[in-house]
């Protein structure tokens, strides 16, 4: 397993900052990717969701005004459709997502990162 982790995050997100702090405290080596400055592609987000082992709907921030306005939490859209919408609107992506090798964890709460440390 590759020891270096990758954190997909938004720097202003409190859960992202807490996760990064836990990783630093553990001495883990990682790269932080601000997916607002380095946007995710459809392919990359699909890969992350596959590593998480969940449907795309589980990575959707349903409480975001845009998600509520588009009624994205109500179902009816395929994973591919949801992924495309999330890539176009990164505020809709749950964060942070931490990847180590073939494993990924959605760190909500931040303590979930300990599974990869």
Please report, for each region that a protein language model flagged, where it lies by residue:
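Thiol/selenol-based redox catalytic cores and closely related redox-interacting motifs
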Residues: 37-117
């Amino acid at each position: 397993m590759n020891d270096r982790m990758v954190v997909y995050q938004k720097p202003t997100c409190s859960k992202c900052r807490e996760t990064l702090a836990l990783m630093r405290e553990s001495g883990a080596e990682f790269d932080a990717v601000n997916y607002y400055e380095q946007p995710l592609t459809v392919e990359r987000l699909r890969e992350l969701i596959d590593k998480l082992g969940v449907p795309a709907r589980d990575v959707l921030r349903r409480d975001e005004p845009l998600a509520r306005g588009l009624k994205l939490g109500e179902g009816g859209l395929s994973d591919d459709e949801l992924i495309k919408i999330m890539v176009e609107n990164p505020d809709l992506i749950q964060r942070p997502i931490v990847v180590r090798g073939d494993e990924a964890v959605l760190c909500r709460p931040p303590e979930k990162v300990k599974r990869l440390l």
